[in-house]
Structures are given as C-alpha cells and as structure tokens.
C-alpha cells in the first residue's frame, strides 16, 4: 500500500503549481515575424523610397523607309535584269556594283498599246535595220508559233473575212464549209476512203460477245468383243489358277 501512495519527485514537481516564467515562451521553430525582417536582411529587403521617382517622357519615333526614285519608263519588251547580266561580261572585273547600276534602265523601244497591229511581214521588213541582234533573236522566238501560217503563204491572211477552223472542218456541214478559207478547204474536197471489208462485231471479247456455237464431235466406235472370245479367255485363266493351286510348295 505504501508503494502505491508514494510518488516520485518528478511526479510531485509536475503536479505542483507552476511558477510564472519571467521570459516569454519561445516558438519551437523560432520563425521571424514580418516586422523583424528589415533589420535582419537589410541588403535583400527593399529600401523605402526617400523621394518620388521622376518620370521620364517616352518619345515614339516612326520608322519610314527611304523612298527610291525610279524613273518612269513605259513597259519594256524585256526585263532589265536580263540585259544587266548580259552586259556584265564586257565590264571590268574590279568594278563594284552600286545602286545606280542596279536601277539603271536600258533604252528599249516600247510598243504603243493603242495602235492597231500591222502585218507581221511588213513590220519585220521595215524594222530589221533598227532592231539590234538580241531583239531580232527574241522576235524570232516569239513568232515561232506562227511558222505554219508563213508556210501557207499570204492566201490565208489575204481573206480576213473568211474563217479557218484549223483542221476541225470535218465537224461542219456542207453549208458551213462555204465560208471556210479556200487554202484549208482544198484538202476537204478529197473523197473519204471507204473500207472494203464490211464492219462486223468482234466476237472474241470474253464476257461481252455471245458464246460461240459448240460443234458436235463424233465419237469413235470401239470394236465389239464377241462372247465366245470372252469365254475362251476366261477358261484359259481358270486353268492357270488351278495348275498353280496343285503345285506342292515345300517350306523348310
């Protein structure tokens, strides 16, 4: 009983009244409050502005491209870039290109847009002396598609009122052929060739053409065997079997 009533010294101290501690109880983590941060971290903590910040005016500048003056020239017949690279061979190798050389335009005869188109043969004969070698070469390349008209002569161009169907005259009737150019119409007067062999449907198309008629084949007649010959052949076979059965076979 005495053992139960007795208490240890540590338990008596815990059960006794606690004396008020003179110091404030500290936190376990000892975290710093917000008011103490400026004194502890003076370098990191931003300082209060002593005076109001002076605002600087913002100036907006507009970027404008420099205007390049290009002389107004009527539409040239060829690109100035092509002529620039062609004339590059005659220039000295040490010369550097400038802006004036890049935008330099060569004198090219311009074609008026509102003037009527004259005859190509008359125009080529009158301007052969004026055109240089390159213009003459380019004009030949452009007029290459008109070589068929040149071979026909002036007969097709002498009658501008008549039309030409360019090889499709077979689709026209007899009345419409009267207004076609006579150069092309002369070829149409030929009589069309008629096939000597009459037309017949192709009978060799599988699945489309009707099936061909089957031809009946005659069966070959086999020679008949007489009953007497069969009896003789059966009797000979039976005699051979009987002789084989009567043979004495000795097995040691």
Swiss-Prot record:
Biased region (Low complexity) positions are 105-116
Motif FGF motif, which positions? 166-168
Keywords from UniProt, A to Z, are: Cell cycle, Cell division, Chromosome, Cytoplasm, Mitosis, Nucleus, Phosphoprotein, Ubl conjugation
What Pfam families does the database record attribute to this sequence? Sororin_C, Sororin_middle
Show where the record puts the motif KEN box: 88-90
Span list, region C-terminal Sororin domain = 230-252
Give the record's PTM text. Phosphorylated. Phosphorylation, as cells enter mitosis, disrupts the interaction with PDS5A and relieves the inhibition of WAPL by CDCA5. Ubiquitinated by the APC/C complex in G1, leading to its degradation.
Gene Ontology MF annotations: chromatin binding; protein-containing complex binding
Residues that bear Phosphothreonine? 98, 111, 115, 159
Provide the positions where the record notes the PTM Phosphoserine: 21, 33, 35, 75, 79, 83, 107, 154, 209
Q: What is known of its domains?
A: The KEN box is required for the association with the APC/C complex.
Which PANTHER family would you find in this protein's record?
SORORIN
Q: What role does it play?
A: Regulator of sister chromatid cohesion in mitosis stabilizing cohesin complex association with chromatin. May antagonize the action of WAPL which stimulates cohesin dissociation from chromatin. Cohesion ensures that chromosome partitioning is accurate in both meiotic and mitotic cells and plays an important role in DNA repair. Required for efficient DNA double-stranded break repair.
Instruction: State the similarity comment.
Output: Belongs to the sororin family.
What is noted besides the main data? Named sororin after the Latin word 'soror', which means 'sister', because of its critical role in sister chromatid cohesion.
State the oligomer form and interacting partners: Interacts with the APC/C complex. Interacts with the chromatin-bound cohesin complex; the interaction is indirect, occurs after DNA replication and requires acetylation of the cohesin component SMC3. Interacts (via the FGF motif) with PDS5A and PDS5B; the interaction is direct and prevents the interaction of PDS5A with WAPL.
Listed name of the protein: Sororin
Q: Which organism is it from?
A: Homo sapiens
């Amino acid at each position: 009983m005495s053992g139960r009533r007795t208490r240890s010294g540590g338990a008596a101290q815990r059960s006794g009244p606690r004396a008020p501690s003179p110091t404030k109880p500290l936190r376990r983590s000892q975290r710093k409050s917000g008011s103490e941060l400026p004194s502890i971290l003076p370098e990191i903590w931003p300082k209060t502005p002593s005076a109001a910040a002076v605002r600087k005016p913002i100036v907006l500048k507009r970027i404008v491209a420099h205007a390049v003056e290009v002389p107004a020239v009527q539409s040239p017949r060829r690109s100035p870039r092509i002529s620039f690279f062609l004339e590059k061979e005659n220039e000295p190798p040490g010369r550097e290109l400038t802006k004036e050389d890049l935008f330099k335009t060569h004198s090219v005869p311009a074609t008026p847009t509102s003037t009527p188109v004259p005859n190509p043969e008359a125009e080529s004969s009158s301007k052969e002396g004026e055109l240089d070698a390159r213009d003459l070469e380019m004009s030949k390349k452009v007029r290459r598609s008109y070589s068929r008209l040149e071979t026909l002569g002036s007969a097709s161009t002498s009658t501008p009122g008549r039309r030409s169907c360019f090889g499709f005259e077979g689709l026209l009737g007899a009345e419409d052929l009267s207004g076609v150019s006579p150069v092309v119409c002369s070829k149409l007067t030929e009589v069309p060739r008629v096939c000597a062999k009459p037309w017949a449907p192709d009978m060799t198309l599988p699945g489309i053409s009707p099936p061909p008629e089957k031809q009946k084949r005659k069966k070959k007649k086999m020679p008949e065997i007489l009953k007497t010959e069969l009896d003789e052949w059966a009797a000979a076979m039976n005699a051979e079997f009987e002789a084989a059965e009567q043979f004495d076979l000795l097995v040691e």
